Amino acid sequence: MKKLTKKAENLLLLIWVQAFLALAGSLFYSEVMNYVPCELCWYQRILMYPLVLIYGVAAIKKDISFALPGLFMSGIGLLVSTYHYLVQHVSIFQEVGGACSGSVPCNVIYVNYFGFISIPFMAGVAFLIIFVLHLLILREQGRKA
């Protein structure tokens, strides 16, 4: 276990905050706004929710090695949310994957801020931020070695 630099500690805390905000936003839309999640939304939740715990433990222990699964989960989550966004906004993807297999079609757009920001877009940005910040921590630790 290598000691984290102060910059890496701050980035790790920032990742945890991002994961927590994504979890809170997801719960807000489903529990307060009563939006029923589609199948792809559930996959994104499955990949995002554990990140709060994973990065929280890593931040408390001050050890990025605890968070290695988070790098993979955020990368996969980014791919899922990108596909989901394409299902919502690109006609060829709507025909192929619009129905999903759940009770709510995956091409339903509950929110559309500024004409392009939907829930999968917000999830994708969160996954991207987590993924990039994790890579920055690894680079920072590599410089320290």
Swiss-Prot record:
BP term (GO), one: protein folding
Gene coding for it: bdbC
Organism of origin: Oceanobacillus iheyensis (strain DSM 14371 / CIP 107618 / JCM 11309 / KCTC 3954 / HTE831)
Cysteine disulfide partners in this protein: 38-41, 100-106
Keyword Transferase: no
UniProt keywords, alphabetically: Cell membrane, Chaperone, Disulfide bond, Electron transport, Membrane, Oxidoreductase, Redox-active center, Transmembrane, Transmembrane helix, Transport
Localization per Swiss-Prot or TrEMBL: Cell membrane
Stretches that traverse the bilayer: 9-28, 43-62, 69-86, 115-137
Annotated GO CC locations: plasma membrane
Membrane topology: Multi-pass membrane protein
Family: Belongs to the DsbB family. BdbC subfamily.
GO molecular function: protein-disulfide reductase activity
SUPFAM superfamilies: DsbB-like
Pfam families on file: DsbB (PF02600)
Biological role: Required for disulfide bond formation in some proteins.
Protein name: Probable disulfide formation protein
